[in-house]
């Protein structure tokens, strides 16, 4: 006798029912917790709240297409023109931020090693000044070297990330970072680069190439800012507090120090992602 249709549709008496995914109580395993946060889009991951380059360029194109219409209402045209001006300003800020990000990542290692060298030199000069047997002539020399080392440390800490970094130390593979002050040591000791003293003459300044001249101008500008108390006179103390590279203390991150031509500074910021040779490799050795 054939089985009843209702009995066929019912559950098998010896088969365990399958859990219903819509009913969490029907499953033996604990339900996976749902994520409580959403990953924001790439354009929204900016601390300044500025969208990404692609989104800004797309918005500018759409705004220009809207302004190209002839039958646009006067009020809407004015508001659209204002929006275009705001978008172009945001695009310039985003491009600048991208240049700063790339240069910061590119020269981070170079700045780190030069910062470590300068901190070692500062400790060495401090130790020599504490020596009571040091003569007055040597003491004045050590004070001068200590000041120059601090100027160079501020140079490294506050170098604008919109520009290509110009190295302070020559790329000498045989030079060590040994702090030993023994003059009889066979290994070459770490020495402070003679970039500020002796002071170069006018003829020597005229013979400098462009990267060397720009580095010297930046060092003089850094010294002036230290004299005006806009930069720390003892920058080595800020390293313990997590000093951020590329930030000009007291003036803001948009200040271009040591550059006389503003147009050249804007071109350097706009062309920061170009493929020209880096100034670091042009003037690494002196």
UniProtKB/Swiss-Prot annotation:
Lineage top rank: taxon: Eukaryota
Residue runs in coiled coils: 53-103
Region Disordered, residue ranges: 1-57, 167-213, 259-286
Comp. bias regions, Acidic residues: 274-286
InterPro entries, alphabetized: Efg1 (IPR019310), EFG1_rRNA-proc (IPR050786)
Subcellular location: Nucleus, Nucleolus
Biased composition annotated in UniProt, kind: Basic residues: 1-18
GO BP, sorted A to Z: maturation of SSU-rRNA from tricistronic rRNA transcript (SSU-rRNA, 5.8S rRNA, LSU-rRNA)
Sequence ranges of Basic and acidic residues compositional bias: 204-213
Name by which UniProt lists this protein: rRNA-processing protein EFG1
Lineage of source species: Eukaryota, Fungi, Dikarya, Basidiomycota, Agaricomycotina
Gene encoding the protein: EFG1
């Amino acid at each position: 006798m054939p089985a009843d249709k209702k009995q066929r549709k019912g559950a098998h008496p010896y088969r365990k029912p399958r859990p219903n995914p819509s009913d969490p109580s029907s499953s033996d395993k604990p339900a996976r917790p749902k994520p409580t946060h959403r990953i924001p889009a790439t354009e929204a991951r900016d601390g300044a709240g500025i969208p990404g380059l692609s989104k800004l360029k797309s918005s500018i194109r759409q705004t220009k297409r809207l302004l190209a219409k002839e039958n646009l209402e006067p009020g809407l045209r004015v508001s659209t023109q204002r929006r275009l001006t705001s978008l172009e300003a945001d695009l310039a800020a985003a491009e600048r931020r991208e240049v700063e990000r790339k240069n910061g990542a590119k020269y981070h290692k170079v700045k780190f090693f030069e910062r470590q060298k300068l901190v070692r030199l500062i400790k060495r000069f401090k130790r020599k000044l504490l020596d009571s047997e040091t003569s007055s002539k040597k003491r004045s020399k050590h004070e001068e070297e200590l000041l120059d080392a601090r100027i160079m440390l501020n140079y490294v800490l506050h170098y604008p990330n919109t520009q290509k970094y110009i190295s302070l130390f020559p790329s000498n593979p045989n030079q060590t970072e040994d702090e030993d002050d023994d003059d009889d040591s066979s290994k070459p000791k770490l020495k402070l680069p003679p970039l500020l003293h002796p002071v170069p003459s006018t003829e020597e300044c005229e013979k400098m190439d462009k990267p060397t001249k720009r580095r010297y101008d930046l060092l003089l500008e850094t010294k002036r800012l230290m004299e005006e108390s806009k930069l720390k006179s003892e920058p080595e103390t800020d390293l313990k507090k997590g000093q951020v590279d590329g930030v000009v203390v007291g003036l803001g991150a948009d200040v271009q120090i040591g550059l006389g031509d503003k147009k050249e500074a804007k071109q350097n910021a706009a062309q920061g992602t170009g493929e020209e040779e880096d100034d670091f490799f042009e003037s690494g050795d002196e």
